[in-house]
Amino acid sequence: LTAAVGCLHGMFFIGSGRLYGTSGSFLRERALAGYDSIAFPGEDEDEFFRLDLYNTLDNLGMYWHVPNIQAFHSIVPNSIMEFYPYVGVKRDVSSKPEVNNYALRPLLSVKYLAVSQSEKDAENLMPGYTFSFSQFGYDFYENENYLPMGFGYTTGVRQSVLDTAPLSLRANVMLEAVGLSDEAMERNADILTELESIDYASLNASGMEEAVEERRQ
């Protein structure tokens, strides 16, 4: 039993990476200490939201027991394997959306961004984030464009039109309109306005904010 525990302990540290400290202080003081202990301001127990993490241990959100969009996992649902590449995120066993894909965050209901306090200029990583609180060596920034799950649309876009958008801009379009097959678009024509072409001039930070405000209504 002792040998088995020692083996698992060694595998744990190798898997976590030596980058985070040979003494294990990072895992003890930041990762494990945050398990079920991260306190988000005004948190509603029934509210679902995701966390984003910048330039840190991939699975830190899992240690903290908080749903997140950055992870390293060998067992990945097909839906994720299909969705992430579609919106310009490299997908293998690691999910690491880049900060230039800022519109993906509200689309995935990201409410907070955690950044190590050693990082500089963190407040400018993505548009629409304001400092909220600090805990376990991280500064947490709240996403002003956070969208709770279950938002609705008044506009639809045919999949064939959505497919013409560059990968890095598809999340922007998907905030403005829900992607539908031709049959679904025609079936819902009485309740959805069709986005027949993409206005690329609106696919920026301001356009994202406007789309988020529309989804909130």
Report the location of each language-model feature.
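Charged, low-complexity surface segments at secondary-structure and domain boundaries
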Residues: 14-27, 67-70, 86-93, 151-162
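Flexible, solvent-exposed extracytoplasmic
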Residues: 71, 104-217
